[in-house]
Structure formats: structure tokens, C-alpha cells
């Protein structure tokens, strides 16, 4: 059970980081 919990936390953190980078870089890409 511990492995599943750690994997879930890892994916959650990676997802949050990915969203943060996407939201920060999206305005720069759309701004032409």
C-alpha cells in the first residue's frame, strides 16, 4: 500500500509542476 501512496504523491507533484510551467509559458507563446 505504501508504494501506491508514494507513486500517487509523485505523480501529483509532477502534475502540479507541469501545470505551473505550462501556465507560465503559455502567455509567452501566445504573445506574438
UniProtKB/Swiss-Prot annotation:
Transmembrane residues, as ranges?
3-23
Q: Which family does it belong to?
A: Belongs to the PsbT family.
Q: Does the keyword Transmembrane helix apply?
A: yes
Its membrane topology? Single-pass membrane protein
Quick one: where is this thing mainly located? membrane
Summary of the function given for this chain in its UniProt record: Found at the monomer-monomer interface of the photosystem II (PS II) dimer, plays a role in assembly and dimerization of PSII. PSII is a light-driven water plastoquinone oxidoreductase, using light energy to abstract electrons from H(2)O, generating a proton gradient subsequently used for ATP formation.
Mention any Pfam family matching this sequence. Answer: PsbT
Q: PANTHER family this protein is in?
A: PHOTOSYSTEM II REACTION CENTER PROTEIN T, PTHR36411
Q: How does it assemble?
A: PSII is composed of 1 copy each of membrane proteins PsbA, PsbB, PsbC, PsbD, PsbE, PsbF, PsbH, PsbI, PsbJ, PsbK, PsbL, PsbM, PsbT, PsbX, PsbY, PsbZ, Psb30/Ycf12, peripheral proteins PsbO, CyanoQ (PsbQ), PsbU, PsbV and a large number of cofactors. It forms dimeric complexes.
One GO term of the cellular component aspect? photosystem II reaction center
Identification of the protein by name:
Photosystem II reaction center protein T
What superkingdom does the record give?
Answer: Bacteria
Q: Which GO terms describe its biological process?
A: photosynthesis
Q: Tell me yes or no: is Iron among this UniProt entry's keywords.
A: no
The compartments listed are: Cellular thylakoid membrane
For this UniProt record, the keywords arranged alphabetically read as follows:
Membrane, Photosynthesis, Photosystem II, Thylakoid, Transmembrane, Transmembrane helix
Organism whose genome encodes this protein:
Synechococcus sp. (strain JA-3-3Ab) (Cyanobacteria bacterium Yellowstone A-Prime)
Amino acid at each position: 500500500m505504501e508504494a501506491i501512496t508514494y507513486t500517487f504523491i509523485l505523480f501529483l507533484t509532477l502534475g502540479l509542476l507541469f501545470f505551473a510551467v505550462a501556465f507560465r509559458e503559455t502567455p509567452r507563446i501566445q504573445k506574438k
